[in-house]
A protein has these predicted regions:
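Alpha-helical transmembrane segments of multi-pass membrane transport and lipid-handling proteins
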Residues: 2-18, 112-141, 191-192, 199, ...
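Membrane-water interface segments that mark the loop-to-transmembrane alpha-helix transition
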Residues: 30-46, 72, 77, 81-134, ...
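Membrane-proximal transmembrane or re-entrant/amphipathic helices at the cytosolic face
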Residues: 2-23, 468-525
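Interhelical loop/hinge segments that connect adjacent transmembrane helices in multipass membrane
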Residues: 4-32, 221-265, 308-319, 444-456, ...
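Helix-loop junctions and terminal segments of transmembrane helices
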Residues: 85-101, 171-172, 287, 291-332, ...
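Membrane-interface junctions at transmembrane-helix termini in multi-pass inner-membrane proteins
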Residues: 158-183, 369-400, 442, 449
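Hydrophobic alpha-helical transmembrane segments
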Residues: 147, 151, 180-229, 286-288, ...
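Transmembrane helical elements of multi-pass membrane transporters/channels
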Residues: 34-51, 66, 186, 210-217, ...
Length: 525
């Protein structure tokens, strides 16, 4: 099945959504890898666009202007996060659930309610920012002189919320190609508009440039969203109330989860700061950022298709458990070698991305990498709770993780300094895995497949071996061990990914190259 479904009529939406979910295992793996490649490629291009935009704006605006841009951008992000009440995430779930029924009318109703709720929340968010512009200006800049500029940011909040909801519609229907294009072309159009404004008006265009970037994203998302055919329906009040209640109920749980994550991260940093000072806080920040950089990229790329796909199958326990196992296995195969490499080259990575002064954070980074490896394992399981729409259980598990994370940091930082914060991060994910597995087992009868368990064992042993080598052996021996483990895990991952994706579907030139490297194998039995 194409990652970009060709939906030419409302009936086609329903037909695609209700198509039998049981497919050959190799097709499932190929779908995962294709969607990951699409979203990952678009994300990489977005990063390039963002870097170019930042570079150009830095040259045009200078440090002060760029700092002003960052402050205004933070205001937009804060108000947007609060105002949209999590519907950007719950919208994906509701659209995917409607699509999973194969009912074209229900899809149209859910999409219509999502659009109306997002417009209402966008207007409320913009109004909130206008009303609070004076105190926000005083809080941020020390005076109310920039209140009018802060008020103008309300337009950016409105466009962002509308854009997010249209993206949720596209993602929920699993139009992954369109979803990737929305991200890239929205960023490109917004960046070109913002740069043009700054070229003409300089620092005075900082706020208009943020509005232009948001408007560009909204315009592109609207263009692709309007291509999705929908049945014509007239919404009844009872339907609006039911759909909006479900949308906002789960959305609030997502928002609460985000606040818990931010609060726990803030709490850990505050503990490190109070106990060891600013330098230690900087070491932990560097380790935490780099530890999650590659894993975050992989999981974000994979989640764009995995989440709506799982929602559509969530009432079929056997199929949904198969999908979670497939996703977990591919996640480990993609992220595992990266974790082994980061563990091995921790000091070098810190020096390259920051400076040689951050070398002391290497051990903290290794502890964070252990936690991130566990995160890769638990991440697909957690989606079972989210896909079921159980906001209470979702909130409880997130709250438990946050409390354990801060509690462990409070106990360990006093003894081990910033390294203790890394240990706490790892310990929190050990707790998360032990908590999550029995929960999802009771919900859907989930258990690891033999193939997934083998991948967990292989990469668990690999990462643990590299970590222990740096704890027990001289640096030279540890580096040699890490290099060998990274090489071996990379070869293993490539062979497994090629086997799962069925090499016969690759271009002939690629098959010949793989054959020369003796990595060519047949698809799964």
């Amino acid at each position: 099945m194409s990652a970009v479904p060709d939906l030419t009529a409302p009936r086609a939406v329903a037909a695609q959504a209700s198509a039998p979910a049981v497919v050959a295992s190799s097709e499932g793996y190929r779908g995962i890898l294709k969607a990951t490649a699409l979203i990952g490629g678009a994300s990489a291009l977005n990063i390039v666009v963002g870097l170019v935009r930042t570079k150009v704006l830095a040259v045009l605006l200078g440090p002060a202007g760029l700092g002003l841009l960052g402050l205004y951008g933070s205001i937009v992000d804060l108000v947007r996060s609060v105002s949209q009440l999590g519907i950007n995430s719950s919208g994906v779930r509701q659209i995917a659930a409607a699509a999973g029924t194969g009912d074209a009318r229900r899809i149209a109703i859910t999409a219509g309610v999502l659009r109306r709720v997002s417009l209402l929340l966008g207007l409320l968010g913009a109004g909130l920012l206008v009303a609070a512009s004076s105190p926000l200006s005083t809080l941020t800049f020390g005076s109310a002189e920039r209140a009018s500029s802060v008020a103008l940011l309300g337009a950016a909040v409105f466009f962002r919320i509308v854009s997010d909801s249209q993206g949720a519609l596209i993602q929920g229907l699993r139009r992954i190609g369109d979803f990737a294009r929305v991200g890239f072309f929205g960023a490109l159009l917004g960046s070109l508009a913002s740069i043009a404004l700054v070229v003409v008006w300089g620092e005075q265009a900082v706020v208009p440039s943020l509005v232009a970037m948001a408007a560009g994203a909204a315009l592109v998302s609207w263009w692709y969203a309007r291509r999705v055919p929908m049945a014509t329906v007239s919404l009844r009040w009872a339907e609006v109330r039911r759909e909006s209640g479900a949308l906002l109920g789960l959305g609030l749980a997502f928002m609460a989860s985000g606040l818990i994550m931010m609060a726990s991260a803030y709490g850990v940093r505050l503990i490190v700061l109070r106990h060891d000072g600013l330098d230690a806080a900087g070491y932990y920040q560097a380790a935490w950022t780099l530890g999650g950089l590659y894993v975050g990229f992989v999981l974000q790329a994979m989640g764009a298709d995995f989440y709506p796909r799982l929602v559509a199958l969530i009432h079929d326990d056997a199929r949904s458990n198969q999908v979670v196992n497939e996703q977990a296995q591919v996640s480990l195969l993609l992220a595992g070698p990266g974790m082994a490499a980061t563990l091995t080259l921790a000091s070098l990575v810190l020096s390259v991305f920051y400076s040689s002064a951050f070398g002391e954070a290497a051990e903290t980074l290794r502890w964070v990498c252990l936690g991130m490896t566990l995160r890769v394992v638990t991440w697909p399981m957690g989606f079972i709770i989210v896909a079921r729409g159980d906001q209470r259980l979702f909130f409880i598990t997130e709250l438990a993780w946050g409390l354990v994370s801060v509690g462990l940091a409070w106990m360990l930082v006093s003894r081990y300094g910033h390294r203790g914060a890394g240990m706490a991060f790892f310990g929190a994910y050990v707790f998360h895995a032990l908590m999550l597995y029995p929960i999802v087992r009771s919900l859907s009868g989930f258990r690891w497949s033999i193939a997934t368990a083998r991948s967990v064992l292989v990469f668990g042993v690999s990462v643990a071996a590299v970590f222990m080598a740096f704890q027990w052996w001289p640096t030279a021996w540890a580096l040699a061990t890490g290099a060998l483990v990274t090489l071996a895990s990379t070869v293993y991952s490539l062979r497994e990914l090629l086997r799962l994706a069925s090499p016969q579907h690759l271009p002939a030139s690629v098959r010949r190259l793989l054959g020369a490297l003796r990595m060519h194998s047949q698809g799964p039995p």
